[in-house]
From Swiss-Prot:
One of its GO terms (biological process) is rRNA (guanine-N7)-methylation. It comes from Dictyostelium discoideum (Social amoeba). It is found in: Nucleus; Nucleus, Nucleoplasm; Cytoplasm, Perinuclear region; Cytoplasm. It is an enzyme of class 2 (transferase). This is Probable 18S rRNA (guanine-N(7))-methyltransferase. Belongs to the class I-like SAM-binding methyltransferase superfamily. BUD23/WBSCR22 family.
Amino acid sequence: MSRPEHIAPPEIFYDDVESKKYSSNSRIIEIQTKMAERAYELLAIPETAEGLMLLDIGCGSGISGDVITDAGHYWIGCDISQHMLDVAIDREVEGDVMLRDIGQGFPFRAGSFDAAISISAIQWLCNAEKSHHNPRKRLHTFFQSLFNVLTRGGKAILQFYPENSAQIEMITASALRCGFSGGLLIDFPNSSKAKKYFLVLFTGNNNIMPSAKGVEGEEYEQQEEEDSNEVKYSNRKRDRRRVTKSKGSAQHKTKEWIMNKKDRQRKQGREIKNDSKFSGRKRGPKF
């Protein structure tokens, strides 16, 4: 399936039809909300803190902004798609929204925001949508402007979908050159579906990196990718137990084989039942 940034520029891709999915498609809303909640969690804002000002980069229809509102803070969101902002206005979000190309920086005074989050937006900066666009220059402008509008000691959590390792390196290096400290955090790194990339950036010295999820086989609730709306069907033939040609019975799996498979699936982030004394034990004859 083609990546959205390969189909059209964001202001064209997120047209009236695509934008309305973000207010009517429960699956998209659920995924966006969970990623925004994770981004806010990584900010590690003390529960005693109230009324902070946050910047929502690529705010879209305001789903991630709702998470900020629920946490008791104020926010300003910017997005390049007028249609997405129209949906946010129709939803009567609490924050203020503005039309803005983040590759041109932010029109705010220095130190205006205590923190910033972004969900599925900054990978668009790696594409040259116009002849005069230079991805490296646009990334530099973005990160330098973001560094300036954050307070000293502020933090930014940017979730994104990198196309390859070179893109990760280009984004991370650009952020560090602009004065940020921090790095890349990957939730569920062993799972192709649940893997999520977060760029964790600090403007001050309090730069302790948070812990990633799923590194030690932590269980998770499996979810589809944000931009995938396809219905998945199980392959019944593949799911059936393999039958040997000679005896016509299911091929026997040893206890060691079963335990190794369960351990591998846990590392991939799948929900696997806990081991018991019956795990891998041969069952008696059926009635």
